[in-house]
Amino acid sequence: MARAKKSKDSQPLDLNNCQPLEHLQPVPKTRSASIISVESTDSEGGVVEVLAPPQVREFDDLTAFEAFVRDETWDNDFDYFHGRLNYYPPFIMKECHDNLDKIKPTANKNSRKFKRNLQHHVARHLIKDLEKCCGYELHMDKFDTIETPNRITWKFKDESDHGFSKEEEDEYNRHWRLELSVSCNNENPMVEVDYKAIPI
C-alpha cells in the first residue's frame, strides 16, 4: 500500500486544534503540471485542456488519513486530492479489545447492529472529524445508499459553497465538490472510505 510522504514539518494530528480555513487563496502554481491536453469529443474535434485526476493516496489508519486531509488544506490543495482508507472502525476495535482474532464473524454488512453503529460512526465522527481537518464546512447530510448482496455503500456529495462567499470563490476561481463513499462487505467489518475533492 502506498504511504503518504512524511515531511520534516509534519505535526501530529490534534482534532481540537485544527485551524479553520478562513479565506481562499489563488490556485497553487504547481497545479499547472496536472493540466493535460485531451482530444475533445464535441463536433469540432479540437484539443481541450483538462485537469488530470489527483493521485490516489492509500491509508490503513484513520489518524493518518485525517492528517493527510489536514495537510492538503495546509498545502492549499484542499480542492484537489483523493484519498482512500481501509480500516476497522473504532467501535469494532473497542468491542474486540484491539485483538483482531476476537472479531465476531457476524460483524459485517448483514448485521443490523453493525450497520447502525457504522452509520453513527460516519455521521457523528468521521464526517465531523473530516470537517475539522478540512477547515471548512461540509454539507453531507444527504446520501445515497447502494446495497447489493455482497456490499453496502453510502455515497455523500457536497457541492455547496463550503462556507465561503460566491464572490471569494469567483475571485480565485476555487469552485470544488467533495465526494465521500463509505462501504463495507458481507465478509468482515473492514470499512472502505473513498474521499475526493474535485475542482469544477
From Swiss-Prot:
Keywords: Cell membrane, Membrane. InterPro entries: RGI1, RGI1_sf. Signal peptide: none annotated. GO terms for biological process: energy reserve metabolic process. GO terms for cellular component: plasma membrane. This is Respiratory growth induced protein 1. Residues 1-26 are annotated as: Disordered. Belongs to the RGI1 family. The keyword Nucleotide-binding does not apply. Involved in the control of energetic metabolism and significantly contribute to cell fitness, especially under respiratory growth conditions. The lineage of its organism: Eukaryota, Fungi, Dikarya, Ascomycota, Saccharomycotina. Gene3D superfamilies: Respiratory growth induced protein 1. It is a peripheral membrane protein. It is found in: Cell membrane.
